[in-house]
Every structure is written in structure tokens, then in C-alpha cells.
């Protein structure tokens, strides 16, 4: 990976793109530290407990904890992209746009932008009320209804504008930089939390006792998880494909053997995001209602808190469910079998048509289960570790979870692959010139 980056840096055109991408990331990190008018959060907001605030904190690189200009980060854009992707299956009109080539993609991009702004407004309003309910001292004091309404409007506009600006920065990377813009910004936000992770591990290490032994173990486990995610991201099941020979005029076409790759982790981090979002709803509701100690509702809400064991079980089941749900959206065995037949291709030993589609469907189900189990292991490890240490009376908190690691490693690998393809393209171009 480092050799690829070093070789890309030697190419003038790629070097300009890499510098441009780094400058955009720098602008994003500056914006993530710019305060919003009327907001003065002196202490980081508590985003532990497995509620939706944990998700926002992870996605924004802790900018959410301090109410800065980019407090919402790329979250509205990611949520709107997921919604549009799901609507593409439910609404035929959107599904047709996805198949209309460049024009269709432009229309979908425009719809995604409008939906992003709408979600940003809603999330900004919710964030404002959360800050107000958490500690009224975090907002500038106001006198009268007009001043309070004006303050709320300014704060909501700033958070919404910050989210729109983050989306624009991501699109600039897409057009003039390297990698997927939104993914790069998300990567930068998560990586910015690494010093906090190292600092907390060092504090545990210096406390001595059992923490002296646990801290290096945690660090080694994280390194092993990174290696495991790299392997998982590149793992694929290859279905052999044989194309029949056909004669057109005096030329013979086909006859070659190839394969159809099916990625083990075909859904990426989406099942984890979906599962986290669903589980965050009850605990988010709990923040806005008064629950009596020892009541039924307190026990009910505790089930959905990451500080309790039932959360891990429900989380695991939801990840499996959403992995299958996403695989159903992404892969259509009948369509894949029809495309093979149209191109005179077949899987050796399998009859074309329904037998082929059934076979492909069976393979996809098996691969999906394996991939879902693997990402569940990565996502649940930090949660189970914290629950285990808490049960032992240690309560060792980890500031970076498995979701963050999957995103960081996935974005890094994808960016390196794009660099390699850009270098290959320029190599062939120079050869032809």
C-alpha cells in the first residue's frame, strides 16, 4: 500500500490530486473545530450508552460532541443515500433512473442532495433541543420569545449549512481528487479519534495492576482485527463460468473460461449501520422522557443499551437480518442467470435457466451468512470486551469500535485500488502515445 502511494506521488497529475484531497481534508478538520454562534459546549457531550448519539459521534470524528459547524458531518448524506438506494427497490421510477446511465445518475444525485438538506434540517432541530435539554448553559442566554426563536433559527441554519458544505467538499474530492469524497471525509473524521484511543490506552497502562497487562492486549487485538478486516474485504467466492464457442463470419468468438466473483462482505458496513440505527431508537427516546428508577420502562430501555448483555444478542440478530436484506437488493439470481444465458455462458455442471438461478441463489445465501458472521465478530468484539471487563469490575472503555475499523480499512483499501487503476491507466496511455 505504501509503495503504491509513493509511486503515485512521483506522477505529477496524481500528486496534484493527492495534495488537493489532503487540502480538502484539512478544511474539513478546520470546520470541525469552528464554533457555531450561540453554542458554547465547554465539556464534551456524553455519547456513550449505545444511543444514536454514539453513532453521530463516530461518524463525525467527535465534532458532534462539541456542537461545531460540522457537527452533523456526512451523516445526513449517508442516510439520504441509503434511503434512495432502498427506494430504488420499492419505487419503480427511481429504479429506472438507476438504469438510465449518466443522465439517470445525475437525477439521482440531485434527489440525494435535496433529501440531504431536508434530513440535515430535521437533525439540526433535534440536536438543538438535545443541547438545550442537556444543559441550558451550553446555549447563550436569551431574553424574550423572539430572541430565543432567533437563536434557534441561527443554530439550525449553521448546522444545516455545515452539512451542505461537507457534502460539497466530498463532491470536490470526487471531481478533482482521489477516492470517494464522502468516504474520505468519513475516514478523516474517524482517524482523528486515534490519538484519543492511544491516550486512553496509555492512561489505563499507567494505572498499573491488571490494566498494565490489558492495555497491550487491547492494542494487539485491534491490530489483529485490522488484518482480519483486510482479509475479509478481499475475500470472494468465485463461480466458474464457461462461454460457448460461436462462429461469426470467419472469426470464432467465446470459448474462454472465467469466473463470477461474489464478495464475502458484499454489504460492507451497511448492516452494522442499519442495526445500530434501529437499536438507537429506544435509548434516544429515553433521553427525552423521564423514567422512574426500578420501573418496567427503565428495564425495557436497559435492554437496548450497549452496557447490557441483551443488546449484544439483538445487535447480532439484526446484523444477520440486514446482511441478507441488503444481499437481496444487490443480487438477483434470476437476472444473473438470464445474463449468462444471453451471453452463451454457463456454470459447468449446472443446466442453464432455473437450475443456474437456484444454484447462484444458494451460493449467495451461504456467502452472505459467512460475511454476516464475520462482520458480527468485528462489530461485537469491542462491546463484548467492555461488558466482560465491566462484569469483572474493571469497566475499561474503548473509544473506537469495530464499525469504525471496518470503515477506515475499507476506505483505505478502496483508495489504494483507485490509485493503482489511475497509475495503470496512465501507464497504458504513455505506452500508446
Indicate residue ranges for each PLM-predicted region.
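N-terminal cationic and glycine-rich segments that engage phosphates or anionic surfaces
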Residues: 1-98, 103-433
Amino acid at each position: 500500500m505504501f509503495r503504491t502511494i509513493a509511486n503515485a506521488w512521483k506522477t505529477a497529475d496524481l500528486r496534484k490530486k493527492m495534495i488537493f484531497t489532503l487540502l480538502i481534508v484539512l478544511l474539513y478538520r478546520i470546520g470541525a473545530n469552528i464554533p457555531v454562534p450561540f453554542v458554547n459546549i465547554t465539556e464534551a457531550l456524553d455519547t456513550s450508552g449505545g444511543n444514536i448519539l454514539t453513532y453521530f459521534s463516530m461518524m463525525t470524528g467527535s465534532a458532534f460532541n462539541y456542537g461545531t459547524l460540522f457537527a452533523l458531518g456526512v451523516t445526513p448524506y449517508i442516510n439520504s443515500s441509503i434511503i434512495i438506494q432502498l427506494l430504488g427497490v420499492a419505487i419503480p421510477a427511481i429504479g429506472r433512473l438507476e438504469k438510465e446511465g449518466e443522465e439517470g445518475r445525475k437525477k439521482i444525485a440531485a434527489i440525494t442532495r435535496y433529501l440531504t438538506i431536508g434530513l440535515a434540517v430535521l437533525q439540526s432541530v433535534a440536536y438543538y433541543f438535545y443541547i438545550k435539554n442537556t444543559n441550558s448553559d451550553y446555549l447563550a442566554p436569551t431574553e424574550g420569545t423572539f430572541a430565543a426563536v432567533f437563536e434557534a433559527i441561527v443554530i439550525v441554519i449553521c448546522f444545516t449549512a455545515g452539512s451542505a458544505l461537507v457534502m460539497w467538499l466530498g463532491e470536490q474530492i470526487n471531481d478533482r481528487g482521489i477516492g470517494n469524497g464522502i468516504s474520505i471525509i468519513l475516514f478523516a473524521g474517524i482517524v482523528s479519534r486515534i490519538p484519543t484511543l492511544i491516550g486512553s490506552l496509555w492512561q489505563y497502562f499507567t494505572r498499573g495492576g491488571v490494566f498494565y497487562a490489558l492495555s497491550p492486549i487491547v492494542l494487539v487485538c485491534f491490530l489483529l482485527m485490522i488484518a482480519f478486516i483486510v482479509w475479509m474485504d478481499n475475500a470472494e467466492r468465485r463461480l466458474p463460468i464457461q462461454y460457448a464457442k460461436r462462429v461469426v463470419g470467419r472469426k470464432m468468438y467465446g470459448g474462454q473460461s472465467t469466473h463470477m466473483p461474489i464478495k464475502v462482505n458484499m454489504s460492507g458496513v451497511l448492516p452494522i449501520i442499519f442495526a445500530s440505527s434501529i437499536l438507537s431508537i429506544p435509548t434516544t427516546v429515553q433521553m427525552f422522557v423521564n423514567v422512574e428508577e426500578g420501573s418496567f420502562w427503565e428495564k425495557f430501555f436497559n435492554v437496548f443499551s450497549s452496557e447490557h448483555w441483551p443488546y449484544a444478542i439483538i445487535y447480532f440478530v439484526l446484523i444477520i437480518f440486514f446482511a441478507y436484506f441488503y444481499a437481496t437488493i444487490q443480487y438477483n439470481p434470476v437476472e444473473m442467470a438470464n445474463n449468462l444465458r444471453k451471453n452463451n455462458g454457463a456454470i459447468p455442471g449446472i443446466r442453464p435457466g432455473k437450475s443456474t438461478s437456484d444454484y447462484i441463489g444458494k451460493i449467495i445465501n451461504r456467502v452472505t451468512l459467512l460475511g454476516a458472521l464475520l462482520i458480527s465478530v468485528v462489530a461485537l468484539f469491542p462491546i463484548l470486551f467492555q461488558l466482560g471487563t465491566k462484569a469483572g469490575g474493571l469497566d475499561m472503555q474503548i473509544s473506537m469500535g469495530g464499525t469504525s475499523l471496518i470503515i477506515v480499512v475499507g476506505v483505505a483499501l478502496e483508495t489504494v485500488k483507485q490509485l493503482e487503476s489511475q497509475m495503470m491507466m496512465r501507464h497504458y496511455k504513455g505506452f500508446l502515445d
